[in-house]
Amino acid sequence: MDGVWKALAADMHRTFSAAMTICAIIKPAKTIYKRSDIMAFKEIKAEELTWNPFTQIGKGWFLVTAGDEKASNTMTVSWGGLGVWWGKDAATIYIRQNRCTKEFIDAKETFTISALPESYKKELGYMGSHSGHDGDKWKACGLHPYPVDGTCGVAEADVILVCRKMLQTKLDDKTFLDPSMKKRWYDGKEAGNFHTMYIGAIEKVLVKE
C-alpha cells in the first residue's frame, strides 16, 4: 500500500511541476514596444543635432509626450524653442490649460519632444486636433509610446529629446506687451485658455539609426 501512495505522490509531483512550467511559459510578460524598423535609436549630443528649429518646429511640428509605460498622452505642438537656459541645453514648449497632455506633464518631472518624418503629417494633425480626454489617441493614430528613462517618446520618431522640467509659468493678461497677440490667440472660444510655458533641460537626445 505504501508503494501505491508513493507512486501516486510521484505522479502528482510530476503533474504539478509540469503545470508550473506551463504557467511560467504562458505568464503574461511586461511588454515594451518592439519593432526593428522603428526602434533603432542611438544617443548623440544636443549640439550634434542638424535641425533648423524654425522649420522643424513651425512647419514640421513635433509631438510632446508625458507619462510612463503604464499611461501616457501626446499632442502636436508647433510653438516652442531650442537653446541654452541657465547653462543647460534646453527646450521650451507651450501647452494650453485644457489639454490632456498638460495633466501628464504637470504630474511628472520629465517630458519628451519627438520629431516624426514628413510621412506622419496626417497623424500629427490628428494628435493636435483631438484630446486624450475623449479616447486613446495612440490607438486611433497607430502610433506607439516608446518608454525611455521613466517617460515616453514616440516610437516612430526620427529624433526624441528627453527633457527635465526646470521652469513652468502660466501666461495671463499681465504678461502681454502686444495686445494684438492676446486678441488673436486668446479670444472667443479660447478666452482665458492661456498657455503654460515649460522650459526643460535636455537630458538625452536619441536619433534613429
Where are these regions (language model features)?
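Basic, polyanion-binding surface patches
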Residues: K34-E209
